[in-house]
Amino acid sequence: PLDYANLGVRSLRLSEIRTTQFAAAMRMQPDLFSIFGGPNDMLSVTCDFAGIRADLAAIFGDARSPDCTVVTFTMPDPSSINPFGRRFRNRMLHFNDIIREESERYGVLVMDFQHYPIIQDPRLFSEDRLHGNQLGHERVAAAMAWRLGIEGADESWAEPFPDAPPRLRSREQLAADVEWARRYFAPWLGRGIRRTPHGSGLTAKRPVLTPVPKHQS
């Protein structure tokens, strides 16, 4: 039998994940603990890498035990996904280095997505160009299963699509980027200016352990 919980809430910084979600997760006494946070820190005006490393180390150190496997992952290069990706590229790659270093120190499994070109394919992302769509989640789930060594999982998730992503003409791409900025970036920026928490009003989808039917596992 498999019991599953998902405490994730969009838009939280890593320190907020540590203070608002981590203790609840540990009270569930998981034997498999998946943790990821940090990209929202990368998108902030300032980025406290020392604080991020400390939070990550604390989470890894407290979660890792002989009875609990901890798994995390790195981020893909954002420059091909998001109009502002190049601005945050160096931050994201440095963050990936921190993930690798702290994971090695605490014996945490890492799915290193930075080294897999398929994860940079824009067709795996939702319209906000930040979060994965259904296809993206399917690829990530298959990758994590492979990294965990689950029976029947293989590396086929990393195979590229048979065709290249559609390329828009310059004018069409500009129009698409402007529309993206209007629908997603401007509201995000507005919340930041008003100092409204980006995760305000959002809750976890599965905050308690729930049995997963065999056909869904």
What does each of the following model-derived ranges do?
Residues 51-65, 90, 94-101:
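Alpha-helical scaffolding segments of alpha/beta enzyme cores, especially the outer helices
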Residues 80-113, 134-138:
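Substrate-gating cap/lid alpha-helix
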Residues 101, 105, 128-131, 135-217:
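Conserved catalytic region of serine esterases and O-acyltransferases that act on ester linkages
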Residues 61-71, 108:
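A short helix->loop->beta-strand "cap" motif at the edges of active sites that frequently abuts
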Residues 6, 35-36, 71-73, 95, ...:
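Ligand-binding pocket scaffold of soluble enzyme catalytic domains
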